[in-house]
Amino acid sequence: MTISLVKQAHNAISSCLLAGDIAVDATMGNGFDTCFLAKLVGEKGAVYSFDLQQPALEATRQRLHDNGLLQRVRLIQDNHSQISSYLAADHIGLIRCAMFNLGYLPGSDKTIQTEPASTLEALNTLLSLLASPGLISLIAYTGHQGGQHEADKVKEWAQQLSKKEYRVSIQIPQAVKQSPPELILIESIK
């Protein structure tokens, strides 16, 4: 049985993120990962969740409210490249995990999507804020215009990281369909 990339990402995050930790959902979308992270960090942890689009914030706010998790999350309507502008001073260097879903908000305007430049800026920022051990998970959806280019840029960037400080894993499912999503895991081991 094949495990979905989302499940693989969640398994990796679950093995790293503990109650009381700090996490980032860099692309909140419809709030599924934000909710997942909020459950893991518990009442004493915190999640910073980013998206540019108001419908994403509304959907995520409702999902968190319905699950009694809203108080654990800071919803931020801004680009994920601005993470450092919103992080509380006492959370710097304490981010245990961050999640990205690269692409566009399902069911919305497909012209509004993540871009390589801002994604790489966010990743570089997160590396400086990440705890050790720490984990960054990215699922790159490649079936839309620009999707494969962004995935390739992120993989190229990840493969340049110091092997003494980071362990990089890339999962690309055997072509069950054209342009499958790709999972990139970056683990801080410094």
Task: Name each region found by the language model.
Residues 46-51:
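Conserved SAM-binding motif I beta-strand of class I
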Residues 1-22, 26, 32-35, 39, 57-94:
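S-adenosyl-L-methionine
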Residues 99-122:
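Mobile active-site "lid"/loop adjacent to the S-adenosyl-L-methionine
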Residues 147-190:
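Class I S-adenosyl-L-methionine
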Residues 27, 129-140:
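Conserved beta-strand signature within the Rossmann-like core of class I S-adenosyl-L-methionine
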Residues 21, 45, 134:
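Glycine-centered, small-residue-biased loops immediately flanking beta-strands
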Residues 38, 118-132:
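A short glycine-rich, Lys/Arg-flanked "PGG" loop and its adjoining helix->strand segment in the class I
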